[in-house]
Amino acid sequence: MRKNKLEKMLKFPCLFTYKVIGLAQPELVDKIVKIIQCKLPGDYVPQIKSSNKGNYLSISITICANTFEEIESLYYELSNINIVRMVL
């Protein structure tokens, strides 16, 4: 199996922070936490920042990943939320 650069840099288990940017709608945070809870149950405390005009929210949430596949899987699931514009 060929590893990409990010996968080579990480040693598992590790803490990994996602930054999700989406439309400023009340359900955004709940949708993000629900997806993460389904894959990795735990207590998550997302940090939320609003854009200057209030149109977007930036949500940072840290997980404890056991494999690179968990990181990738969550990235794609978070990206598929209809009100999400970007996942970093």
From Swiss-Prot:
NCBIfam families: PRK04998.1. PANTHER family: UPF0250 PROTEIN YBED. It holds the Pfam family DUF493. This is UPF0250 protein bbp_432. GO terms for cellular component: cytosol. SUPFAM superfamilies: YbeD/HP0495-like (SSF117991). InterPro entries: UPF0250_YbeD-like (IPR007454), YbeD-like_sf (IPR027471). Belongs to the UPF0250 family.
